[in-house]
Curated annotation (Swiss-Prot):
Cited Pfam families: ABC_membrane, ABC_tran
Location(s), subcellular: Cell inner membrane
Organism name: Rhizobium meliloti (strain 1021) (Ensifer meliloti)
Binding site for ATP: 366-373
ABC transmembrane type-1 domain sequence ranges: 22-301
Protein's name according to its UniProt entry: Type I secretion system ATP-binding protein PrsD
GO BP terms, alphabetized: protein secretion by the type I secretion system
Subunit structure: Part of a type I secretion system composed of PrsD and PrsE.
A molecular-function term among this protein's GO annotations: ATPase-coupled lipid transmembrane transporter activity
InterPro entries (alphabetical): AAA+_ATPase (IPR003593), ABC1_TM_dom (IPR011527), ABC1_TM_sf (IPR036640), ABC_transporter-like_ATP-bd (IPR003439), ABC_transporter-like_CS (IPR017871), ATPase_T1SS_PrtD-like (IPR010128), P-loop_NTPase (IPR027417), Type_1_exporter (IPR039421)
Lineage: Bacteria, Pseudomonadati, Pseudomonadota, Alphaproteobacteria, Hyphomicrobiales
Membrane spanning stretches: 22-42, 59-79, 148-168
Span of domain ABC transporter: 332-568
Amino acid sequence: MATSKGRNADPAAALRDCRAAFIGVGVASALVNLLYLTGSFFMLEVYDRILPSRSIPSLIALSLLALLLYAFQGAFELIRGRMLVRIAGALDESLNGRIYRAIVKAPLKLRMQGDGLQALRDFDQVRSFLSGVGPAALFDLPWLPFYIAICFLFHPVIGLIAIIGGLILTLLTYLTNRGTQAPAKKASEAGGLRNVFAQASQRNAEVVHAMGMSARLTALWERRNTEFRDENRRTSDIGNGYGALSKVFRMALQSGVLAAGAVLVIRGEASPGIIIAGSILTARALAPVELAIGNWRGLVAARQSWQRLKELLNALPEADAPLQLPDPHERLTVEGLASGPPAAQRLVVSDVNFTVRAGGAVGVIGPSASGKSSLARAILGIWPAYRGSVRLDGAALDQWDSDALGKHVGYLPQDVELFAGTIAQNICRFAEDATSEAIVAAAKAARVNDLILRLPNGYDTEIGDGGMTLSAGQRQRVALARALYGDPFLVVLDEPNSNLDAEGEQALSEAIMSVRSRGGIVIVVAHRPSALASVDLVLMMNEGRMQAFGPKEQVLGQVLRPQQVERQNALKVVAEGQEAKQ
């Protein structure tokens, strides 16, 4: 089965690629529904021909033929079910990579709600529905008129009863859809918020325990869980109510067909076989409707999930990879940069202009909330540039393929996050072609090789989700090695010494100097003065704007001189006050 794999895979194309498989399911459904007539005609022949003739050989032959047809019916049912499972697998093969990339990209491009994993749950919902009995019922529904037509061939009265039953069950299907759609959507939204709250509580377990927040958070959890449970129960109650009503109605309708057939036989207007055959056929005609009602909740959930997936993927289109550019090796240029959070349209950084050549290192300083970390995100393209540009060797970031650019960029975020896996896997960024030499070289560049070797399994030590088995300082130094892996041209470090001791700070300074010595560029967001030891340039940020940029001694002199004057004036005021008291 062909699939539209790759960067440009989209839901519509994935479904088109499955067109032949859906046609195959339709053909299998046609054969299954034709073979469903076996039971009705078997009973008709038994009552109208076999019993009057009292022929045992004819009964045996007819029974063998029925068994053969039932075997074919079962085989086609099996084929149809397996084809639906493989359609679900083909959609997964086609879209799973695109959906994963969208999940990762969405926080950088869109204003997200919930835990950001709704798309993954939506895709699981669609795949689960396609692999179940719901689609088979939908493929059987178009055969309802065919069965009703056969009922008319038996007798117009039986056909009329089947039509009335079909219309009533169709009405129940419509009411089921209308009644469950809104609560199902609310239940999905409430479930997402509940999951986000649970994950946040788990991440902050130490804070919850230390500050005695468990009781209050439990009460809040119970309110959110109650909202989810109530909407879920409402959806189930509506679906189960209409499902039970349709089942009772179908059983009553089947008894009505038996009664009508008996009346027709008594009046001599039909043969005795019509009583049983008509009942079986009517039940079969209406069974897909009842099955559809029973699986309507899954259908509604799958339809809503599919719609959300399409909206997400349409909001995050994937362009073809641009032309491969030469490796950057000359300069970083920031021109009139204005940036802010994704989809917020709110500028946090404005009017930033500077150029750094190979071998240079910039320390970004400024008071809290001055835009230092925001500038780092904008330089890396994590936050969009609403005005201006960031260029490497003259090429704007959007002219690079993100994967290709990533090889030339190292990033140590302020909040370090490692992945579940080994230390070696985290350092090499999970590259399958990574060599031991490159991994060890990155660790040595970050001066963390000896620390790693002291761990139980060295580079093969499993660190758990988020690096939970490591201390904060160890995580930061492993993340620094990850940023230095592959000798990237641009290395951005956001408060890299926040969790480091004196030894770690010395290792950081040496790592910055090693990047500069090989011709790389380092951007260091500094909160402690010690982080500026190995930089030659300083950029001063204040209220989201660049206040100064230039050689370290010059900029620090401009910054520190007013502070020294202010301190001296303060001391003078204190001294004068003491003299006045004396």
